[in-house]
């Protein structure tokens, strides 16, 4: 289960996010961030189910979604919304051998908001209390250090790809697959049924 939650009932000052039309709503704003993570980890699903709603007073676009990605051996739940006052884990993975819980995702956005520059070996490095925790049968919970986040490496790859010096880290097909999930989620929410991917 992946969450990208906020607590902010106010409308965005960016009107393209708040007016009905192509690319509007939370599915296009926060959705791609967790959809691409799920597809990167688990591949393309076989089916998609989604529930999207308008929860903020006066909103004209969906601002809450829950998507289920169906795989032969598992399901992956993706959620995002604006009314999560108490933080829930950003990542929860549960299986036969145990569970992995991570309370928050990458810290780079918070660091940028705090005015820090994306440079140096400590950039994107999490505090130990923010590491994920692995729980396994017969063992004590164990903190799992995260790799340092590095937005700049992504943009450097884009630059190098445009110059023909590297293959893109995110392919056109990756983007298309994320859009297929969004399209299936919108169709599912409208029809209230599971959609073939």
Regions found by a protein language model. Give the residues of each.
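Predominantly a Rossmann-like dinucleotide-binding segment in NAD(P)-dependent oxidoreductases
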Residues: 1-58, 192
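Glycine-rich beta-alpha junction loops
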Residues: 3-8, 54-56, 82-84, 97, ...
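A general structural signal for well-ordered alpha-helical segments in protein cores
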Residues: 34-35, 151-156, 182
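Active-site beta-strand termini and strand-to-loop segments that position acidic
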Residues: 67-73, 93-96
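C-terminal glycine/acidic-rich active-site capping loop/insertion
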Residues: 92-173, 197
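C-terminal capping/lid region of NAD(P)-dependent oxidoreductase domains
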Residues: 187-197
């Amino acid at each position: 289960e992946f969450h990208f939650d906020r607590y902010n009932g106010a409308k965005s000052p960016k009107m393209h996010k708040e007016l009905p039309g192509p690319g509007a709503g939370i599915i296009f704003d926060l959705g791609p961030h967790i959809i691409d993570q799920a597809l990167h980890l688990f591949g393309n699903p076989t089916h998609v189910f989604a529930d999207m709603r308008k929860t903020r007073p006066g909103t004209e676009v969906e601002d809450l979604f829950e998507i289920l990605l169906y795989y032969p051996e598992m399901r992956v739940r993706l959620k995002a919304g604006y009314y999560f006052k108490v933080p829930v884990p950003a990542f929860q993975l549960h299986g036969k051998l145990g569970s992995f819980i991570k309370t928050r995702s990458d810290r780079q956005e918070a660091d940028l908001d705090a005015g820090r520059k994306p440079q140096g070996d400590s950039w994107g490095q999490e505090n130990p209390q923010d590491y994920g925790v692995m729980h396994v049968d017969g063992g004590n919970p164990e903190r799992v250090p995260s790799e340092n986040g590095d937005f700049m490496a992504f943009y450097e790859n884009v630059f190098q790809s445009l110059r023909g010096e590297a293959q893109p880290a995110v392919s056109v097909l990756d983007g298309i697959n994320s859009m297929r999930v969004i399209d299936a989620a919108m169709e599912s929410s409208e029809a209230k049924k599971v959609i073939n991917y």
